[in-house]
Amino acid sequence: INNFIVATEPLGEAAKDLLSEPVAVADTRFVVNYWRLSEDNRLLFGGGESYGYRFPDIIKTVSKPMLQVYPQLAKTRITHAWGGTLAITVNRMPCFTRPGQNVLSASGYSGHGVAMATLAGKLMAEASAGQMERFDLMASLPQHRFPGGVALRWPLLITAMTWFSMRDRLGL
C-alpha cells in the first residue's frame, strides 16, 4: 500500500489555530489521516492511499482530506510532497518470526515503521542476548495470510481497500 504526506509553507503564528499543543494527531478512518506541526510551523499532513506501482498526484490526493479538516488552509501553499510503499499485514499488527535457527525477523509495521522498527530492534537485540520472552510474545500474535493466493491477492486487496475507503467517505 502506498501512503502520502505533504508539508505546507511555514504558517507562523497561524499554526496555533490548527494545533495549540505539540502533538501528533490521527483520525479514526480506515484510510487514516494524520498530521502534526513541524519545528518551523509547517503543517505535515498525511493521508490517502494507492495500491499500484504508480503514485497519484500527491498534492491533489492529500489536499482534499487536509482541506476537509482545515478549510482555512485553502490558499496555503504546499511546498513538499512525498510518499512511500508500506508493508501492511492483514490484522495491521507487526509480524515477528524466527524463520530459522539463530534467525529473527520483524516486518509488516503497517505504517508505524519508525516506532515499531525501533521496538523490533530492541526486542531482537534482547533475543540475541538470550532474553527471548518479549520477542516471543510478539511472535505469538496470530498472523494470517492474505486470502486468494497469488492469483487473487491483488484483486481482493483492491476490492477490500476500495470498500473500506468508500465506507470512510460515506461516514460508516
Residue ranges: model-predicted function:
Residues 1-13, 17-101:
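Active-site substrate-recognition segment that forms the wall
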Residues 100-105, 110-172:
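C-terminal lid/capping helical subdomain adjacent to the catalytic/cofactor pocket in oxidative enzymes
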